[in-house]
Amino acid sequence: LDKIYGAVINIAPAVEARLWKGAAFTGQVILPVWNNMVGQMDYVRAGVLTLSQEFGLPGGAFGRVTVGNFTNNRMGADLNLRYATPDDRWMFGVEGGVTGSSTFYEGKWQVSAWKRVSGAAEVRFRERRFNMDFNLGVHRYIYGDYGVRVDCIRHFGRTTAGLYAMYTGGEANGGFH
């Protein structure tokens, strides 16, 4: 290692097109401006390239399936199912996905088999008086580790601020979002 930091400046325009009811295509290209890294950072490359379809389910539940090239060099498929109570105070959800790597090295797009399985079960409580959400989720991450995450989110008009804490792989972490 000859650098104590890595820096990357990219321009990454994206477009989202509604195709039909509930369907969307998202396309992004990443244009490198400057970096002190080696590898894919030197090349024009695909960013997010996804096709998603939202759908309703009996009893007021809803879902979304998404396939394509995601962030963090992942490509695969994701299924998300949610149910919110009629007053929207409670929301319950499950999510599952299968992915492989998607990288761009030496001018070639390289993908692996979709073998990494992830999933989550989540519950959200909305406190209306202070316009806050409290989320609790248990997760299985793509490398097989399990974890729990708690979020406290406050909405101020069009601005949102939150805190989170998580525990996975024997380590605790937290921060702001």
Feature-to-residue mapping (PLM):
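Short, well-structured alpha-helical patches and their helix-loop capping segments
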Residues: 69-73, 115
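Outer-membrane beta-barrel proteins
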Residues: 26, 36-39, 74-76, 101-105, ...
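Feature captures outer-membrane beta-barrel proteins of Gram-negative bacteria and organelles
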Residues: 9-20, 44-57, 76-96, 117-127, ...
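Transmembrane beta-strand segments that form the barrel wall of outer-membrane beta-barrel proteins
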Residues: 1-2, 25-35, 58-70, 91-99, ...
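Short helix-loop boundary/capping segments
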Residues: 108-109
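Short amphipathic alpha-helix initiation/capping segments at coil-to-helix junctions
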Residues: 112-113, 141-145
